[in-house]
């Protein structure tokens, strides 16, 4: 049997790109400002340098204890109408559950970033990640922001520094970039994310931001981001914990030209939404692959559910089942645990027809291994099941009797 050399590569060697394609009119970077131990990057910035007005959209945590930067950024986004020119992000300290002083610190980071970026008509957003309950070393951060502002650039190295500067328990920096064509124009998307623990649907210690030089209105971008996040960052699970700080931001400056995308009923809107959704799914998958203590990357796909909401609910229930995760970790083809989770998923009774439910293990290559077909158990080839389960990545297929599009959910065990 031939063994792939990739089995012996570290996660960083497998998943951190050596080059990329980056959107026009954005400068990024990362430095050490004194939050973490010496020489570890802990402050990142993104700035629109195109000379064109940029717009931003965001999706924030659903946790009731929203961190100070989440509250401040949501407030700024609403007041500015989405006219955002820059982002500032620190790692190593979450500035969460820090009271009024924490809010003051977050606002002072925004003010310092606005000054460094020379923002006048536009504003900055702020994000933080790290330990909860401690005040920021705000003096270090405020001293670092103007220094960082002078070191921004648009190269692959600058984007990598930016990705490194937002990491906490991550074992590798997470970044993705791509080019795509729309209406005869070529555009680029680039983004970074962090997260390895406290990851579950509705996001969790998870920060991410991405930029595009495509021309899109703020309302259209918000609609696209909400759609994309629901099908990416809100469809992943590692440990089922939800954080106080998670934030995903998208910013667009239209620097590559072309007609403005604003009408949701146009092919251009649908095409851009598809590009951003696929991009977000790729970035979110890196978070799952870096899950704390994780050994496998599993995609749970539900087909023919009664509705999109039901499919997502079933997939999420299976993904967060401790018994399912235990079985997968132990390479145990105990598909009864999958069926059990499907059965207690909080969907209406008519959504799951037990006589038309099928379950399969789906390898990345080769034919699916059928475990249950229309409610009837199959004779399972245990050796083939073990071969599939020992892989780093595979899928689980659940088919119901209704005719609907498939729904994917990513879990790590």
UniProtKB/Swiss-Prot annotation:
<comment type="subunit">
    <text>Heterodimer of an alpha and a beta chain.</text>
</comment>
<keyword id="KW-0511">Multifunctional enzyme</keyword>
<keyword id="KW-0028">Amino-acid biosynthesis</keyword>
<dbReference type="Pfam" id="PF01960">
    <property type="entry name" value="ArgJ"/>
</dbReference>
<keyword id="KW-0808">Transferase</keyword>
<feature type="binding site">
    <location>
        <position position="168"/>
    </location>
    <ligand>
        <name>substrate</name>
    </ligand>
</feature>
<feature type="active site" description="Nucleophile">
    <location>
        <position position="205"/>
    </location>
</feature>
<dbReference type="GO" id="GO:0006526">
    <property type="term" value="P:L-arginine biosynthetic process"/>
</dbReference>
<dbReference type="GO" id="GO:0004042">
    <property type="term" value="F:L-glutamate N-acetyltransferase activity"/>
</dbReference>
<keyword id="KW-0496">Mitochondrion</keyword>
<keyword id="KW-0055">Arginine biosynthesis</keyword>
<feature type="binding site">
    <location>
        <position position="205"/>
    </location>
    <ligand>
        <name>substrate</name>
    </ligand>
</feature>
<feature type="site" description="Cleavage; by autolysis">
    <location>
        <begin position="204"/>
        <end position="205"/>
    </location>
</feature>
<dbReference type="GO" id="GO:0005759">
    <property type="term" value="C:mitochondrial matrix"/>
</dbReference>
<dbReference type="GO" id="GO:0006592">
    <property type="term" value="P:ornithine biosynthetic process"/>
</dbReference>
<feature type="site" description="Involved in the stabilization of negative charge on the oxyanion by the formation of the oxyanion hole">
    <location>
        <position position="129"/>
    </location>
</feature>
<comment type="pathway">
    <text>Amino-acid biosynthesis; L-arginine biosynthesis; L-ornithine and N-acetyl-L-glutamate from L-glutamate and N(2)-acetyl-L-ornithine (cyclic): step 1/1.</text>
</comment>
<feature type="binding site">
    <location>
        <position position="194"/>
    </location>
    <ligand>
        <name>substrate</name>
    </ligand>
</feature>
<feature type="site" description="Involved in the stabilization of negative charge on the oxyanion by the formation of the oxyanion hole">
    <location>
        <position position="130"/>
    </location>
</feature>
<feature type="binding site">
    <location>
        <position position="292"/>
    </location>
    <ligand>
        <name>substrate</name>
    </ligand>
</feature>
<comment type="pathway">
    <text>Amino-acid biosynthesis; L-arginine biosynthesis; N(2)-acetyl-L-ornithine from L-glutamate: step 1/4.</text>
</comment>
<comment type="similarity">
    <text>Belongs to the ArgJ family.</text>
</comment>
<dbReference type="InterPro" id="IPR016117">
    <property type="entry name" value="ArgJ-like_dom_sf"/>
</dbReference>
<dbReference type="InterPro" id="IPR002813">
    <property type="entry name" value="Arg_biosynth_ArgJ"/>
</dbReference>
<dbReference type="GO" id="GO:0004358">
    <property type="term" value="F:glutamate N-acetyltransferase activity"/>
</dbReference>
<comment type="function">
    <text>Catalyzes two activities which are involved in the cyclic version of arginine biosynthesis: the synthesis of acetylglutamate from glutamate and acetyl-CoA, and of ornithine by transacetylation between acetylornithine and glutamate.</text>
</comment>
<protein>
    <recommendedName>
        <fullName>Arginine biosynthesis bifunctional protein ArgJ, mitochondrial</fullName>
        <ecNumber>2.3.1.35</ecNumber>
        <ecNumber>2.3.1.1</ecNumber>
    </recommendedName>
</protein>
<dbReference type="InterPro" id="IPR042195">
    <property type="entry name" value="ArgJ_beta_C"/>
</dbReference>
<keyword id="KW-0068">Autocatalytic cleavage</keyword>
<keyword id="KW-0012">Acyltransferase</keyword>
């Amino acid at each position: 049997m031939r063994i792939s050399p990739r089995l012996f590569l570290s996660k960083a060697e497998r998943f951190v790109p050596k080059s990329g394609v980056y959107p026009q009119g954005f400068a990024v970077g990362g430095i050490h400002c004194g939050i973490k131990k010496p020489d570890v990057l802990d402050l990142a910035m993104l700035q629109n340098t195109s000379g064109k007005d940029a717009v931003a959209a965001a999706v924030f945590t659903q946790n009731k204890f929203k961190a100070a930067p989440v509250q401040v950024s949501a407030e700024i986004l609403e007041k500015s109408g989405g006219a955002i020119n820059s982002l500032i992000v620190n790692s190593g300290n979450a500035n969460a559950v820090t009271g009024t002083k924490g809010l003051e610190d977050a606002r002072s980071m925004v003010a310092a970033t606005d000054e460094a970026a020379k923002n006048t008509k536009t504003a900055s957003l702020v994000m933080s990640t790290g330990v909860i309950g401690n005040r920021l070393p705000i003096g270090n951060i405020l001293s670092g922001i103007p220094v960082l502002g002078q070191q921004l650039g648009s190269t692959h190295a600058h984007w990598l520094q930016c990705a490194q500067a937002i990491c906490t328990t991550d074992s590798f920096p997470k970044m993705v970039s791509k080019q795509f064509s729309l209406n005869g124009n070529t555009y680029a998307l680039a983004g970074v994310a962090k997260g390895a623990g406290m990851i579950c649907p509705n996001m969790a210690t998870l920060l991410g931001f991405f930029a595009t030089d495509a021309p899109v209105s703020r309302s259209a971008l918000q609609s696209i981001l909400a759609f994309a996040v629901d099908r990416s960052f809100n469809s992943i699970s590692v440990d089922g914990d939800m954080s106080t700080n998670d934030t995903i931001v998208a910013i667009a400056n239209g620097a590559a030209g072309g007609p403005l995308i604003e009408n949701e009923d146009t092919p251009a809107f649908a095409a851009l939404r598809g590009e951003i959704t696929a991009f977000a799914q790729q970035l979110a998958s890196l978070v799952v692959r870096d899950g704390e203590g994780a050994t496998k990357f599993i995609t749970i796909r539900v087909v023919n559910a009664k509705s999109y909401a039901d499919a997502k609910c079933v997939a999420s229930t299976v993904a967060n089942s401790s018994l399912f995760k235990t079985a997968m970790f132990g390479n145990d083809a105990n598909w009864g645990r999958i069926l059990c989770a499907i059965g207690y998923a909080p969907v209406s009774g008519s959504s799951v027809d037990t006589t038309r439910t099928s379950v399969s293990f789906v390898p990345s290559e080769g034919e699916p291994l059928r475990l249950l077909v229309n409610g009837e158990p199959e004779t399972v080839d245990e050796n083939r099941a073990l071969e599939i389960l020992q892989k780093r990545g595979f899928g689980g297929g659940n088919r119901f009797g209704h005719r609907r599009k498939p729904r994917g959910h990513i879990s790590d065990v």
